[in-house]
Amino acid sequence: MEDFVRQCFNPMIVELAEKAMKEYGEDPKIETNKFAAICTHLEVCFMYSDFHFINELGESVIIESGDPNALLKHRFEIIEGRDRTMAWTVVNSICNTTRAEKPKFLPDLYDYKENRFVEIGVTRREVHIYYLEKANKIKSEKTHIHIFSFTGEEMATKADYTLDEESRARIKTRLFTIRQEMASRGLWDSFVSPREAKRQLKKDLKSQGQCAGLPITVSHRTSPALKILEPMWMDSNRTAALRASFLKCQKK
């Protein structure tokens, strides 16, 4: 799973996921399913935000990479991916500026068009079950919830899906591709099932030589589809800006 994650996701996303796990004392090399889940969630948050801007009239517009008007204000502020101290600093700044109600839990995004915080969910289960879990945890009507699944389903607060259909389809397609690639490498079942995940973890530990004396065959084949999985959705200029913004505060 770790090899898959490093080949499948943008290096910046992998780096942010590693830092997030280490912040909580977790090891990406051991808890590989969580590593994959965090990378997937980060990517969906970035895709949710990318190419969405607010023009001088306060209207939401979609501008593709390379457009000369790309200096317009981004519609979404990305909170997910920052260390907790910086994330809360951003949230407090937004609340002071917009007078939005401060959330009890760190949200993933802030939508400047709708003036609300957004919680993004990516689930391997039924969307309505995960939605209810999120809503029960947050307990706030002020935070908008949007759930995506690997099967193409989605659910959002008051059926308000925020983004246009094409932008949401892009996210759903990416999630479906990740699922298909995991399945082709025999990783999907362990990603979905906790019991299967434990079995896969034991297998991974053996392959790393931590269970010496137990024979195991490890496949090093790389799926051809992985060669075209490098995400092309992210504005290269914004990628650099996001990297600098997210990582500079973590340097010691």
From Swiss-Prot:
UniProt record similarity statement: Belongs to the influenza viruses PA-X family.
Cell compartment(s), UniProt: Host cytoplasm; Host nucleus
Coiled coil: none
GO biological process, alphabetically ordered: viral RNA genome replication; viral translational frameshifting
Residue numbers annotated as active site: 80, 108
Keywords for this protein: Decay of host mRNAs by virus, Eukaryotic host gene expression shutoff by virus, Host cytoplasm, Host gene expression shutoff by virus, Host mRNA suppression by virus, Host nucleus, Host-virus interaction
Residues marked Important for efficient shutoff activity and nuclear localization (site): 195, 198-199
Site (Important for efficient shutoff activity): 202-203, 206
Entry protein name: Protein PA-X
Organism annotation: Influenza A virus (strain A/Equine/London/1416/1973 H7N7)
Entry domain remark: The probable endonuclease active site in the N-terminus and the basic amino acid cluster in the C-terminus are important for the shutoff activity. The C-terminus acts as a nuclear localization signal. The C-terminus is recruited to host protein complexes involved in nuclear Pol II RNA processing.
Function text: Plays a major role in the shutoff of the host protein expression by cleaving mRNAs probably via an endonuclease activity. This host shutoff allows the virus to escape from the host antiviral response. Hijacks host RNA splicing machinery to selectively target host RNAs containing introns for destruction. This may explain the preferential degradation of RNAs that have undergone co- or post-transcriptional processing.
GO MF terms held by the record: RNA binding
Superkingdom of this protein's organism: Viruses
Primary site of residence: host cell
